[in-house]
Amino acid sequence: MSSKKKQNYLFSEPETTVAQSIILVIARIVFGFMFMSHGITKWIIFKDMTETFPDPIGLGPTLSFWLVILAEILCSFGFILGALFRLSLIPMIFTMCVALLFVHGGDPLTKIEPAISYLTIFVLMFFTGPGDFSIDVIMRRMK
């Protein structure tokens, strides 16, 4: 019988080496800021896009627009810091799935390549975790 405490996968982190953690933090910073830049751009042109923004899941263009901005800015911030890491990734993954399947579904590869790239990185990061240099791991170790 194992004496280990059962951990919730959503909040547990696998052990990583220093080199792996460095690579993960670099990936979080690079892809997090790249993804965040899309949200900041949308926020800047908010007034021009609210009525014309795609609404593939029927929430209305304004609400869909706000949810995408939330995923691209706020969740990117959590992704970069490694704070509520997997929880932050869920809206980011969902946003990229919707963009890929519904918004850009019939577009050529050159148009859907960013969504495929982000989706791939986000899914991989969901399963690897944020690495040792993250708020989640630091908070867990302080307990």
What are these regions (language model features)?
Residues 1-44, 62-70, 77, 81-143:
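Extended, low-polarity transmembrane helix blocks
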Residues 50-61:
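Perimembrane loop-to-helix junctions flanking transmembrane segments
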Residues 43-51:
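Membrane-interface helix-loop junction between the first two transmembrane segments
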